[in-house]
């Protein structure tokens, strides 16, 4: 082997052959000089080998989680400015960039990993001001805001504004809405006011501040989804009344609400036509009591249009009555648009795939915009409203790319392609630029400008210089059969240089309506998990990330597979199939396979240990569900359901708790005790059952922390504990 100069340009010292060491010994010093040169060379060789090893083998968890995760990318309606939320090591700030050069820079300067999320962002039409929310939604039962730092003054859920030109953020009011993703900021067409829903009413505040937020009107029910009319004179809203709901129009010049074609049904998602003459909305049947819980049944729906002045309306289109005709769960709200040319864009799964359609507001048959065996996810209109920009997995099933299609129909145009991933497209007001968020297998999510030849990263300085991209592996797409023949996709992470059998891990996402991809994920929770899987791979584990049935992007039949969840846990067979796949690899020791996951992935972790400790030697369970019967008993309509007790029994039998007497392998339980999604009591109860059955378990509890943990330092602590636990349980 010929050694070349090390990095930095220094020449390697010459090596004297051992046969020459005896020469010059007569002067009493020659051999010592030669020996010193040899030792220096060996030291140099050792340093070179260490540097080469570090270049691909060694990095810290903090390094691979040091990225500046971007989210909530938005574009101004009348300027070339875009904005997004950046979360770097738990410090969340707003960044902006502007056409044509898109030099990115922060406009807020928060400095602490304080657990204060920024779940919503909007720009005024001219792009001069950003309006955003800080804090998390209220617990519906207690009315509290998550306070993960245990601050003695508590935490708040507030709306703020900051001018892009500079200055300190100003408080506009409290939002205090309940429910995941309830933060819905709507800025008026003139950019002077912002409306939002909170405390069951709609509120309005001046963007300039100086005046307290005011309740828009006193309206019965829970009022959500405020939408400004194009002229700014009215606000449409959805008023939920329990078993029915209305679309109401608040006119700033009137003293009463106009309701659009009120009925016994449930109306939602109001959308104004570009000229303000019509409002489109979705109508579903009102709540029917006494229905059984176990059978699957269709959820038909219709699109209505109405005159916002008179309230008169009519049905524009209605779905069929099969399961595929149900209102799609994936993108029903985000895909519902009133576009240019008097056309309404909507999502439907009538052919078994989540696709976009459009229909003229004057009537007629809908047009399929996105044909094929793939699914659409992010959806937005172009600045002129004549085309739809969307992300999908078309032609690249385990990635996302961007596409464009005219609202009247035509061949979709691919905007991005290749071994990258893109999502959340936006277009500048002049229609010249498309921007998005994106990642690769080894580069974390960042904002990008889409070009004719690819994409250009914005805000490169936000990516830490020591981020270990060169040391990460590119996961391999794998497909394997489950016990019933269903084909399951996964991503296989293999340590570099791995040739002999060693430990392996199965990882399961939560949701379960999620899909993991061949790179850093678009959701913060899974972006973190992808980094942890890279870290575990770096420590010597083969990791298989499993897209089990019930996940998205493989068609409705896959997502809505029968006998899953509390109705039979059929999805668990996919996890066993993943273990069997690993057992068949020559680089995996079949006796040292563990599993880990969070939320639904935590449930499947517990299921694996409870049912198959002979397959899974250890597991880490982040906030998993352990007893489905508790959730079944809290379903709407449970009390009046004729099969209530049968459903509860079925839920119990589909749970890890039901098989705890077979549980033998050790487990690490991790959860925050202020979890709004999976009650902490699920972990408390499981721990008592494990104790009673003498099963070894360890625990890491974060007081006052949420389900999707808000503190970066808690993610790091949890992931370090995961790696250390597997090191003790699976390494020889």
Feature map (PLM): residue ranges:
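Beta-strand-rich domains and repeat architectures in extracellular enzymes and scaffolds
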Residues: 62-92
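Residue-level detector of Asp-centered blade-edge/turn motifs that repeat once per structural unit
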Residues: 77-78, 125-126, 189-190, 230-231, ...
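Hydrophobic beta-strand positions that form the internal "hydrophobic ladder"
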Residues: 82, 130, 194, 232-235, ...
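A flexible loop/linker signature enriched in serine peptidases of the S9 family
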Residues: 85-95, 110-116, 133-160, 169-182, ...
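Short loop/turn segments that connect beta-strands within beta-propeller blades
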Residues: 98-102, 163-167, 206-210, 251-255, ...
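Blade-loop segments of beta-propeller domains
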Residues: 103-126, 130, 134
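Serine-hydrolase catalytic core recognition
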Residues: 290, 421-732
């Amino acid at each position: 082997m010929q050694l070349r100069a090390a990095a930095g340009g220094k020449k390697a010292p010459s090596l004297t052959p051992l046969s020459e060491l005896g020469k010059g010994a007569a002067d009493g010093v020659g051999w010592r000089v030669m020996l010193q040169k040899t030792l220096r060379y060996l030291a140099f060789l050792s340093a070179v080998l260490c540097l080469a090893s570090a270049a691909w083998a060694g990095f810290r968890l903090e390094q691979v989680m040091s990225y500046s995760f971007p989210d909530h990318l938005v574009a101004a309606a009348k300027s070339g400015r875009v904005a997004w939320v950046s979360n770097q090591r738990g410090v969340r700030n707003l960044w902006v960039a502007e056409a044509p050069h898109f030099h990115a820079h922060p406009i807020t300067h928060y400095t602490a990993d304080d657990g204060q999320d920024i779940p919503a962002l909007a720009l005024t039409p001219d792009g001069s001001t950003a309006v955003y929310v800080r804090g998390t939604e209220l617990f519906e039962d207690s009315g509290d805001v998550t306070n993960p730092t245990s601050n003695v003054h508590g935490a708040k859920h507030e709306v703020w504004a900051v001018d892009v030109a500079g200055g300190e953020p100003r408080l506009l009011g409290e939002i205090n809405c309940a429910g995941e993703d309830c933060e819905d900021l709507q800025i008026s067409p003139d950019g002077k006011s912002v409306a939002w829903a909170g405390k069951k009413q709609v509120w309005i505040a001046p963007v300039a501040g100086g005046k307290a937020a005011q309740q828009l009107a006193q309206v019965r029910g829970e009022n959500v989804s405020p939408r400004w009319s194009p002229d700014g004179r009215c606000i449409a809203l959805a008023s939920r009344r329990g078993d029915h709901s209305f679309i109401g129009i608040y006119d700033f010049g009137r003293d009463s609400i106009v309701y659009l074609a009120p009925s016994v049904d449930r109306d939602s998602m109001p959308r104004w036509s570009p000229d303000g003459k019509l409002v489109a909305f979705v109508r579903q049947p009102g709540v029917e009591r006494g229905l059984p819980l176990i059978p699957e049944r269709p959820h038909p729906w219709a699109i209505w249009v109405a005159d916002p002045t008179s309230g008169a309306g009519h049905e524009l289109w209605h779905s069929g009555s099969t399961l595929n005709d149900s209102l799609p769960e994936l993108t029903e709200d985000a895909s519902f648009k009133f576009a240019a040319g008097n056309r309404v864009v909507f999502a439907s799964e009538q052919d078994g795939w989540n696709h976009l359609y459009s229909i003229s507001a004057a009537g007629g048959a809908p047009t399929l915009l996105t044909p094929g065996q793939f699914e659409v996810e992010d959806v937005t209109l172009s600045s002129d409203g004549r085309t739809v920009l969307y992300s999908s997995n078309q032609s690249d099933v385990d990635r996302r790319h961007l596409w464009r299609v005219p609202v009247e129909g035509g061949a979709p145009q691919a905007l991005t392609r290749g071994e990258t991933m893109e999502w959340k497209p936006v277009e500048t007001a002049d229609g010249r630029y498309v921007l998005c968020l994106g990642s690769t297998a080894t580069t974390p999510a960042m904002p990008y400008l889409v070009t004719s030849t690819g994409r250009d990263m914005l805000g490169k300085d936000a990516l830490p210089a020591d981020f270990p991209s060169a040391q990460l592996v590119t996961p391999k797409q794998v497909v394997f059969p489950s016990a019933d023949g269903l084909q399951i996709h996964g991503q296989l992470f293999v340590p570099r240089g791995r040739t002999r059998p060693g430990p392996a891990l199965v990882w399961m996402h939560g949701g379960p309506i999620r899909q993991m991809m061949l790179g850093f994920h678009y959701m913060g929770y899974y972006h973190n998990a992808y980094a942890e899987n890279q870290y575990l791979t770096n420590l010597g584990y083969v990791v298989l990330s499993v897209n089990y049935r019930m996940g998205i992007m493989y068609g409705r039949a896959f997502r809505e597979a029968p006998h899953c969840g509390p109705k039979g846990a059929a999805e668990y067979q996919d996890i066993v199939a993943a273990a069997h796949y690993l057992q068949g690899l020559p680089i995996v020791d079949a006796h040292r396979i563990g599993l880990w996951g969070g939320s639904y992935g935590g449930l499947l972790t517990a299921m694996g240990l409870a049912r198959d400790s002979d397959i899974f030697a250890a597991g880490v369970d982040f906030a998993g569900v352990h007893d489905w019967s508790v959730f079944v008993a809290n379903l709407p309509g449970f009390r009046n359901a004729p099969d209530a007790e049968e459903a509860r029994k079925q839920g119990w039998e589909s749970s890890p708790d039901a098989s705890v007497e077979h549980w033998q392998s050790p487990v690490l339980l991790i959860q925050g005790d202020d979890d709004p999604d999976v009650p902490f009591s699920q972990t408390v109860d499981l721990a008592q059952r494990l104790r009673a059955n003498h099963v070894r378990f360890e625990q890491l509890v974060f007081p006052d922390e949420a389900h999707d943990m808000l503190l970066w330092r808690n993610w790091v602590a949890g992931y370090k504990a995961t790696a250390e636990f597997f090191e003790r349980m699976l390494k020889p």
